[in-house]
Amino acid sequence: MAIILKNGKSFNKDGVIERTELKIENGFITAIGSKLHSEEADEVIDVQGKLISAGFIDLHVHLREPGGEAKETIATGTLAAAKGGFTTVAAMPNTRPVPDTKEQMEWLCKRIRETAYVHVLPYAAITVGQQGTELTDFAALKEAGAFAFTDDGVGVQSAGMMYEAMKRAAALDMAIVAHCEDNTLANRGVVHDGEFAHRYGLYGIPSVCESVHIARDVLLAEATGCHYHVCHISTKESVRVVRDAKRAGIRVTAEVTPHHLLLCDEDIPGPDANYKMNPPLRSKEDREALIEGLLDGTIDFIATDHAPHTEAEKQKGINAAPFGIVGLETAFPLLYTHLVETNILTLKQLIDLLTVKPAECFGLPLGKLAVGERADITIIDLETEEAIDPQTFVSRGKNTPFAGWKCKGWPVMTFVGGKLVWQKGRE
């Protein structure tokens, strides 16, 4: 079946927006031009002047299945991804059970094939049960379909354990993806160790809790030659460590979340658990350093750390509620409105940070809008302004600090392998 998307616009190879029509056949892009022959298509879709982009890639998502289906499932999480314009996501392993054996990884891959709306890359755990005491069988997990290795949700506390993990990963040409948190410094914290924590008498998580862990790991990465990736970087000290490591030629990459780019602890209105995430919202100076790191290439791409929880869990109060917020359905509108329309990023930079940049970091054949590429495509309305309403989310999680924020840049159609998997108004 041949589909033509007509009356669109996209970036050409020189980074200039131009009129675009695009043909999809057998799951791939087969033609791009300013005017294609509609009679050659089985279906013609008029995108009415909207932006045609390669589908977004999110390499940090919690789909919660198995074991956390009250929060999210592979089906609901990937439909939320499609609604947000994401055509590929990577699923974190802090599920129950953890994908730490060949059999569990095979089960997970089968479940993904059966229920996912978008492409899902499954992470395997670094340690058995994510307990930090015994390494998993990396070779068997890779053979079973693991994308990379991480214990995200907790940091690997033992330097010796991480050193051995990096050696094994390097031998398999696989990445170690790290949640960086030194438990001896975390101090039972629930928010950043700053003015907000002090005002409300809350335990704080100091910046050094993260940066010390990263500093340790980049030296281990240098010693092993492993590709080491830093999850959800959040402090100015961490940015400095990663910048120095890159200058030294160490194979390190890093991601940042939309919420750490847009919010700081000064923005928290009170002890509201929808502002509780790990790492926490840091200082204004940290947020500015993250933006600077994104602009100078220290930080490689943006990932949401989509972390759905039930309403009941988030109503337990800021001390008892779990860490995490949702992000798949709001990431692009928030970033477009508050970084592009404010001239911090260009539209081309933002799209690259959500497409080609994550693909390049992990060697994925994704993220490009070109003839011969897989037809993973999102269509974006850059003009219509709407307020974020958690009750309209297709994710089971409604936990967001951005409720009521007015944004432009809403995805309206998402194609995965040439198949229309989500369209606004046809939910």
UniProtKB/Swiss-Prot annotation:
Enzyme Commission designation: 3.5.2.3
Superkingdom of the organism of origin: Bacteria
Reported cofactor(s): Zn(2+)
Entries under SUPFAM superfamilies matching the protein: Composite domain of metallo-dependent hydrolases, Metallo-dependent hydrolases
GO (cellular component) term, any one: cytoplasm
Residue sites binding Zn(2+) 2 per the record: 152, 179, 232
Residue positions of the active site: 305
Pfam families: Amidohydro_1 (PF01979)
CDD domains: DHOase_IIa
Record-stated family: Belongs to the metallo-dependent hydrolases superfamily. DHOase family. Class I DHOase subfamily.
Protein name from the UniProt record: Dihydroorotase
Gene source species: Geobacillus sp. (strain WCH70)
Lineage, highest ranks first: Bacteria, Bacillati, Bacillota, Bacilli, Bacillales
Gene: pyrC
